[in-house]
Design a protein with these regions (language model features):
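Von Willebrand factor
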Residues: 345-404, 409-453, 481-488
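An acidic, Ser/Thr-enriched
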Residues: 145-222, 226, 230-353, 479, ...
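N-terminal, polar/Ser/Thr-rich
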Residues: 20-110
Length: 1015
């Protein structure tokens, strides 16, 4: 049941991060696990997470004696295949530059660390390149700094020399944006520092600047823990320095806090400096530290373990305080309040959702199976009836109904799970829709849900509020946070909060046993949060309830003195209780203001369009990269001015608008519309209207038509793919190792997709391709690529959601709206298709898109003819008739014997449409009008197309239609270009025939056949 309550939403919070100490797996559990994971062994290294306490019922339970001694290795997960801080610079989809060295500086204050990393990459090619810098961050890390520049060193340099390294004096680990570049003045040439810019404007400015062959870069949020930065130019035969700065919270283990730095193994040289304020800090591997004032510094060169950990013994509730010179004072604290624990009644039936996507391969899947076995074994009396839904882009049930939770059934389940392939993207929304309303269930029932997934929804619905609505009327959802990189904690928190469930932290095997029963504890309703001496108090995650053992990140404004306390008001059975937790001694830290800014931005972003302006102001001021803003660097100040990127009144907005009060006020006004698809579409139109780079004008008649459309017209549910191939044994021989290494070859994946299309089904083919999206979330080129393939496979709902993600990130590219309209038309969603067809016709788009308007008008006219003459239900048929009459008169072409359109998926690419007529005359970019009346639209040499050929009266004979591939982005080494072609015969008549085709263009091959038409 949805449990959002305004009185609780006024505060914020972190859904239950509960951690428990394992008292020992049963022999049966171990035997079950042996069946499932014997072939899924991962690399090793500890990965601790959060607090564990002994003797607490439910979510607070377990744990040893806290800070008296460090936990052993069994308290943490092994080192994952997906290593935090790992990076690469891709030039195309197959080639990457070599990482020569990596220098890392870590500053730890209380529960938080600031990390600055210098990467040195070599372009050993003889030509300039554009690269995509991909960085995998630790869980919940928040980047705030990005810079890029060429060095004077040759690419052949292997070991960094002293001038290439950044000198670090005792205690001087510069991490403020104003200091980082200054400290590196001698280390690079003409470096560029990124600025915070609204995300849509950053994408537009970047694309425009690349076309001028100058030096931009953009850092974008691309999914959980994944940031993508396009860098240009990468000079030939030179080393290039990329600097990244981010903040991350330490992990609580027992009563201790731990920071863990994972180093990628591909770095040929690594230097690490760590500075800590806590005198009790211990470090592993052990090295001698040096004292510098109140801080202790540790230095490493080429550490063999590739993992460095810092343990703070029993720090209590660390309190960071700091000032922003333009705004005022801020504080941040991490607290685990003591709450009484008691058992709660629950459903005796449960559905487990187990993520089998590529991101689970292999490390997470092993964890999910261990958790699954423990929960089933230790809750046999309470969870009597179970079923399991395994999901990625597809979803399939273990059994066609609930089965008894018996040891024999659990053993069978785990044996079956061990046979599954781990591939594909993650369609979380489709899985939740199926889990809450199983196809095999005749009579709806209320059952609890256990989500064993990283929560990163890389496929299908991406609106978190819309996904949350799928839980309306369902039982509680419980999720588990492993601490592994790539976890979308915000999604897990949101879903558990909305369903009345909880998220439990499971740092390692030692915490599984208690976490397995944590859901049985009774939650406390959160009524209020105060901090003595503080104001504008926010709690990360916006919980409606607290569980015993809860770890809360609390931030706010004000100057806190010694003796400050967190004061919670909680309620159970109508009885209120005040819980007071003393905070630690204040630690002066520059990290406190940004900790506040990060949580405040997350609050405001959650309310979407209603607080979009304030969210951007907060994100810009506190340098919070994510859903609202990107880091963008351009060549000069003039370039920033050219795109209207200038300092706004962000400081004033942040100072004058406390986030907590604004959040509470706007939430009360907008709660009913969050997740509503019609409201989301109207918000899209509002953003387009406010975008100065588009200059869109929305007619009143269109607004009226949108208002007439029912809410259902805007819903585009995407059912899980109905695949046939699910077993690991059914994978291509060479594919399984690639998936396990997360080292995907585009050619291998596309070959696998072609084989599956022939041998199994289109859905199986698309599942193979979706692994590219899972591995590269946020990559618009890949999303378009796979979207075109989905259209070609006849899977139009999947294509629509891929194109929608591209449009969200690149709203200034009009061809995407046309693609969305085409997909919707194929789905029979005619009202929404009409709405999207109109968008390219309402804006003033960049000239590089050629005669886009003419092509969309012809396409739209074809659609309107079908809508007005067909039987598809529409709420705006009168509007469609009026638009049909107006467009037909405007175009002045009632019919045509042959119409051909092409569009493609890569920017800065010159693809030309060539049509050879029966006479032998060829219509192409330099001969656009033929003697028989054939015409071609203007040549598009920079964008994504489209181009169109029209012949009204076609002489009899053969028409050869081809795409000529003259130029791709010269700065990329090997990205693919795909053409989506539509061929109309007898356009505008009852004999009209439509052929759609996707053609992959091969580098080095100029001419590619599309179709042959006989008249």
């Amino acid at each position: 049941m949805r449990t959002l309550k305004l009185s609780v939403w006024i505060v914020a919070g972190l859904a239950a991060l509960v951690s428990c100490k394992m008292k020992g797996d049963s022999a049966q559990s171990q035997r079950n696990m042996d069946l499932a994971v014997s072939e899924n062994v991962s690399a090793s290294a500890p990965a601790p997470m959060v607090e564990a306490k002994e003797g607490m019922a439910g979510p607070g339970g377990g744990g040893g004696k806290g800070g008296e001694k460090p936990a052993d290795d069994k308290a943490t997960w092994k080192r994952s295949q997906i290593v935090p801080n790992s990076s690469r610079v891709m030039v195309g989809d197959r080639e990457e530059l070599a990482l020569r060295s990596m220098q890392t500086r870590v500053t730890i204050d209380g529960f938080r660390a600031r990390v600055v990393i210098d990467y040195l990459y070599a372009n050993d090619r003889d030509r300039q390149l554009e690269g995509t810098f991909q960085l995998r961050l630790p869980e919940d890390a928040s980047p705030y700094y990005f810079a890029f520049g060429e060095t004077s060193y040759e690419a052949s340099t292997v070991k960094p020399t002293k001038p290439m390294l950044i000198a670090v004096s005792d205690g001087d680990l510069a991490n403020d944006p104003r200091e980082i570049a200054q400290q590196r003045k001698a280390a690079w040439q003409a470096p560029k520092e990124a600025r915070m810019v609204p995300r849509e404007k950053a994408a537009f400015a970047y694309g425009q600047t690349v076309r001028r062959r100058v030096d931009p870069g953009i850092v974008e949020w691309a999914g959980a823990g994944v940031f993508s930065a396009r860098v240009f130019p990468l000079a030939p035969r030179k080393l290039h320095r990329i600097v990244v700065g981010y903040d991350v919270d330490l992990t609580r283990i027992g009563k201790d806090l731990e920071y863990r730095l994972d180093l990628p193994e591909q770095a040929t040289a690594a230097v690490v400096d760590v500075s800590v304020t806590d005198p009790r800090a211990t470090i592993s591997p052990s090295v001698a530290g040096t004292q510098a004032g109140s801080r202790r510094r540790f230095h490493f060169e080429d550490p063999k373990d590739h993992t460095i950990t810092v343990r703070l013994a029993n720090p209590g509730a660390p309190l960071l305080v700091g000032a922003d010179e333009k705004i005022g004072s801020f504080f941040a604290t991490r607290v685990a309040p003591e709450l009484p624990s008691s058992a709660a009644p629950g459903s005796d039936s449960a559905v487990f959702l187990v993520d089998t996507s590529l991101s689970s391969n292999p490390d997470r899947f092993n964890i999910w199976l261990k958790l699954l076995a423990a929960i089933l074994d230790q809750n046999r009396a309470s969870l009597r009836h179970i079923n399991v839904l395994f999901f990625s882009v597809d979803a399939h049930w273990w059994k066609p109904g609930f089965v008894d939770n018996t040891p024999a059934n659990v053993a069978e389940l785990l044996a079956f799970a061990g046979t599954l392939a781990l591939e594909g993207a993650t369609d979380l929304g489709a899985a939740l829709r199926e889990a809450t309303h199983p196809a095999w269930q005749q009579t709806p029932s209320r059952h609890d849900l256990f989500l064993l997934s990283d929560g990163a929804a890389t496929w299908g619905e991406s609106d978190l509020h819309a996904i949350g609505h799928l839980l309306d009327g369902a039982g509680s959802l419980f999720a588990y946070q492993t601490g592994l990189a790539g976890t979308d904690t915000a999604t897990l928190v949101h879903l558990t909060r909305d369903s009345g469930g909880a998220m439990f932290a499971v740092a390692g095997e030692s915490e599984i046993a208690a976490a397995a029963t944590a859901h049985r504890a009774r939650p406390w309703r959160l009524v209020g949060v105060e901090v003595t001496g503080g104001s504008d108090v926010l709690v990360a995650g916006n919980p409606t309830a607290l569980y015993p053992g809860q770890s809360m990140l609390v931030v706010g404004r004000g100057t806190l003195a010694a003796g400050a306390a967190l004061v919670l008001t909680v309620e159970q059975d109508g009885k209120r209780q005040v819980v007071k937790t003393p905070l630690g001694a204040p630690v002066a830290s520059a990290l406190a203001p940004r900790a506040y800014g990060q949580i405040a931005t997350a609050h405001l972003e959650e309310l979407e369009a209603a607080t979009e302006g304030e969210a951007r102001a907060y994100a810009t001021h506190f340098r919070v990269t994510g859903r609202t803003c990107s880091l963008l660097m351009l060549e000069s100040e003039a370039d920033y001015e050219r795109f209207g990127i200038r300092p706004d009144a962000d400081d004033y907005v942040v100072k004058a608008t406390p986030a907590a009060a604004l959040f509470a006020k706007v939430l009360a006004q907008t709660l009913a519309t969050l997740g509503d698809p019609k409201a989301a579409f109207l918000a899209l139109l509002g953003r387009l209207e406010r975008n100065p780079d588009i200059k869109i004008q929305i007619p009143a008649s269109y607004r009226t038509a949108i208002a007439q459309m029912p809410d259902a017209a805007f819903q585009v549910p995407s059912a899980p793919l109905a695949t046939r191939l699910r077993a690991r044994s059914e994978l291509g021989r060479d594919l399984a190792p690639q998936l396990a290494r997360h080292d995907l070859s585009y050619d291998a994946i596309t070959a696998e997709a072609a084989a599956r299309r022939a041998q199994a089904s289109p859905a199986d083919a698309l599942k193979a391709l979706s692994s590219l999206v899972e591995e590269n979330p946020g990559d618009a080129v890949l999303a378009r690529d796979v979207g075109f393939s989905a259209m070609d496979l006849g899977l139009h709902a999947q294509a629509f959601h891929l194109f929608r993600r591209v449009a969200d990130a690149r709203p200034h590219e009009p061809q995407t709206y046309r693609a969305m309209a085409q997909a919707l038309a194929q789905l029979g969603k005619v009202d929404l298709a009409l709405a999207y067809y109109e968008i390219p016709l309402m804006g003033q788009w960049d000239p590089r898109f050629g005669e886009l308007r003419k092509i969309v008008e012809l396409d739209y006219l074809h659609f309107l003819r079908g809508l007005t003459s067909g039987n598809a239900p529409s709420s705006v048929r009168d509007y469609a008739r009026a638009r049909l009459d107006g467009l037909a008169a405007q175009i002045g072409m009632g019919r045509a014997d042959l119409v051909v359109t092409i569009t493609w998926n890569t920017d800065n690419t010159d693809v030309d449409l060539h049509v050879t007529e029966p006479s032998g005359e060829e219509c192409f970019y330099s001969h656009r009008n033929t003697r028989s009346g054939g015409t071609l639209t203007q040549d598009v040499t920079q964008g994504y197309g489209p181009e169109m050929y029209v012949l009204r009266e076609a002489p009899k004979g053969r028409y050869d239609i081809r795409a000529h591939y003259y130029a791709s982005d010269a700065n990329r080494a090997s990205a693919r270009t795909k053409v989506y072609a539509t061929v109309f015969e007898n356009w505008g008549t009852k004999q009209e025939k439509v052929t759609e085709k996707v053609v992959t263009l091969e580098t080095g091959k100029e001419s590619h056949p599309i179709a042959t038409v006989e008249r």
